[in-house]
Regions:
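Charged, low-complexity intrinsically disordered terminal segments
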Residues: 1-259
Length: 259
């Protein structure tokens, strides 16, 4: 999701162009999402991402410099902002690398919101190891699903994480579609990358990595506000599941790389 206006402003995040994203219609309860607005030099990175995709789809080879606007004054800013994109045409899994790097940097806490939790072994291991090492790892996922089978696979991934000490909450008012990480109040990312195989390895995605930027406090505050509206999930709940539901989830996990 990329929107660039005149080369001076850029938006990205989880928000698509559809009525439910603005809660103009209700499909899965309250739709909770996030996005980030960029100004300044970082906008050029988003412009190049869009133009690269445009040229790939249209079979063009344009001179991108003609789309670069004259420099404009921007507000004083502290910290670092780095937009990034991920593409299946490149063997490097950029989105996964960003997430794994952030998890590895954590000393105190990790706050994550994701609509889907269908993680590969590396990501699952990183989250579990962080929790076992004393880092407070908090995950918020939806309580009302948009895709039932994906929801069941997401829940099938809960037990190993809960057993390692990861705190998992479900957003009870509806469907949370935000894809955010916050680490120790110093690092954050907002973008389109879900914690699932398709998003990490098969889709065209993008995001913005932040370090010591003032808006990180806004992202963290939004997480805390969302947490108050979410229900904690306990491991005990999964130890007494209906055997047929356990079998159903186990079968679905086999197809996790396709989800």
């Amino acid at each position: 999701k990329i929107a660039v206006i005149d080369g001076y402003y850029a938006y990205t995040g989880g928000i698509n162009i559809a009525d439910e994203y603005a809660n103009l219609i209700v499909r899965f309860g309250h739709w909770k999402d996030s996005a980030i607005l960029l100004e300044g030099d970082a906008v050029w990175s988003m412009t190049v991402m869009f133009l690269s995709m445009w040229d790939h789809c249209a079979g063009l080879e344009e001179d991108f410099d003609r789309f670069r606007p004259p420099a404009a004054p921007v507000r004083p800013w502290t910290g670092y902002v780095q937009p990034y994109n991920d593409t299946p045409l490149d063997p490097e899994a950029v989105g996964q690398s960003v997430y794994l790097n952030m998890i590895a940097r954590a000393k105190k806490y990790i706050y994550i919101t994701t609509p889907y939790l269908i993680v590969d072994v590396a990501t699952n291991t990183a989250l579990c190891n962080a929790a076992k090492s004393g880092v407070d790892v908090y995950l918020i996922t939806p309580h009302i699903p948009d895709k039932r089978y994906v929801f069941e696979v997401t829940r099938a991934h809960y037990p190993p994480l809960l057993d390692a000490g990861v705190h998992i909450y479900e957003y009870t008012p509806g469907f949370i579609h935000a894809k955010n990480f916050v680490v120790d109040g110093r690092f954050a990312t907002v973008g389109t990358v879900n914690l699932d195989y398709r998003s990490l390895f098969l889709h065209f995605e993008d995001g913005v990595w932040l370090c010591d930027a003032p808006c990180i406090h806004d992202i963290e505050r939004d997480f805390q506000d969302t947490l108050t509206l979410s229900e904690p999930i306990t491991l005990r709940r999964f130890r007494h599941l209906n055997i047929l539901l356990q079998l159903y989830r186990s079968i679905l996990r086999v197809f996790a790389p396709l989800m």
